[in-house]
Curated annotation (Swiss-Prot):
Cofactor needs: Mg(2+)
Originating gene: coaD
PANTHER family per record: PHOSPHOPANTETHEINE ADENYLYLTRANSFERASE
Family (UniProt): Belongs to the bacterial CoaD family.
Coiled-coil positions: none
Residue positions binding ATP: 9-10, 17, 88-90, 98, 122-128
Protein species of origin: Acidothermus cellulolyticus (strain ATCC 43068 / DSM 8971 / 11B)
Main location as per UniProt: cytoplasm
Classification via Pfam families: CTP_transf_like (PF01467)
Gene Ontology MF terms in the entry: ATP binding; pantetheine-phosphate adenylyltransferase activity
Annotated keywords: ATP-binding, Coenzyme A biosynthesis, Cytoplasm, Magnesium, Nucleotide-binding, Nucleotidyltransferase, Transferase
UniProt-recorded name of the protein: Phosphopantetheine adenylyltransferase
Listed NCBIfam families: coaD_prev_kdtB, cyt_tran_rel
Signal peptide from the UniProt entry: none
Amino acid sequence: MRKAVCPGSFDPVTNGHLDIISRAAALYDEVTVAVLVNKAKRALFSVEERMDMVREATAQYPNVVVESFSGLLVDFCRARGIPVIIKGLRAVSDFDYELQMAQMNHSLAGVETLFLSTNPLYSFLSSSLVKEVAAYGGDVSTLIPDSVARRLRTRLFDPSREPDH
């Protein structure tokens, strides 16, 4: 079975993420979406909420599974027998950082990295940008799935709905 992982914080998952995940699902027998647990970074959504959003958004792909991870991604890969990391590249600036990470991951554990160029429709898109625009009342409906947009509006405009960290 050919396996790959698509890692990220997915806070929240965007249509750009989903483009990469769907393309990975077409290339591999099993794609694990690995949602990062980073206690040093304050996320808008808890890891459980982010995993739920990714599961909802990828429900049409039977070969996509969603898990969380902390620590080194290569340790996560090694424990699950995943030999390939899939990363989307939006711009040359992404490549500079991701190439270093790919080389380190290969050096540490022999894990390969496959770079997919982002669909030009999403080349500017990031979770941070979505959150910022939404916080100011901007329309992000074409950038994220509807279910994510509903959760985002609730989180941003209903202060009683803090994440469970």
